[in-house]
C-alpha cells in the first residue's frame, strides 16, 4: 500500500468501518503514519467486541438472526451482509487493535467503546521524530 502523498502531508487521518477490510491493516497504519505530520492525529472507528460477556452473547444472536433477516429485506446482495458479520467476528478486540496501532508508528493510543462495545473509536498521535 503506497498512498500517493508526500510524507507529513496531513494534520490527521481518519478511517471508519474500513480498516478491517484492508488485507494488511498494520501496513495501512504505517502508511497512515507516514503521510501525517509529527503530532498529527489518527482516529479509527470500527466494529468491535463488546466487553460484557452477556451483551456479547446477545449481540451474537442479533448478528445470526436479525442482521441476515434485515439484509434479505433491504438488499439484493445477501452475501455482503454475510461478509459483514464474518468480518466483524474475525476482527480483533479493542486491546489488540490498540497494540497494533502502537506497534505501527503511533503513540498515545487510546480507545473508547461505543454502543456497549459494538463499535470502538481508537485515537493516537504520531510521535515527534
Give the positions of each predicted feature.
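A short acidic, Gly/Pro-enriched loop at the edge of an enzyme's catalytic core
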Residues: 1-13
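A short SAM/SAH-binding and catalytic strip from SAM-dependent methyltransferases
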Residues: 11-25, 48
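Residue-level signature of catalytic and energy-coupling elements of molecular machines
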Residues: 18, 66, 124
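Residue-level signal for the nucleotide or nucleotide-sugar donor/cofactor binding architecture
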Residues: 20-24, 89-92, 119
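A short glycine-rich, Lys/Arg-flanked "PGG" loop and its adjoining helix->strand segment in the class I
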Residues: 26-41
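C-terminal alpha-helical "lid/dimerization" subdomain adjacent to the S-adenosyl-L-methionine
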Residues: 45-104, 110
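C-terminal lobe and adjacent flexible extensions of AdoMet/dcAdoMet transferase-like proteins
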Residues: 99-129
